[in-house]
Amino acid sequence: MASRKILLVDDSKTALLMERSIVERHTSYKCLTASNGIEALEKAQSESPDIVVMDVVMPQMNGFEACKKMREHEKTRAIPIILVTTRGEEAYIEAGFQSGCNDYITKPINGQEFLKLLQSYLGE
């Protein structure tokens, strides 16, 4: 079986490094990265990741908008999307689900919970 591909999207290089480190240390998944919603859309369409983990607050296009746009395109419509942010208020979480995300986690990310969430969406 080919290695699963995860698209990690965050404008923070530190957050990307941390998420990538968790994934690569504990799985055989291949990590792709993007630093904003526009790059995320381009990579999601060209690389066909198995799942997208995306920050909400980013320059150029935020995670809510990128999620909505991914749901509009045939090629990216069915890709599971997990939104990540420091804000955990109920209204903010609801806005994430209304944008089309499958799940929502808050920072700081717990490595074990993050891996379990990824594996649950990837059927492992």
Indicate where each model-derived feature is located.
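Active-site beta3 strand of CheY-like receiver
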Residues: E47-V53
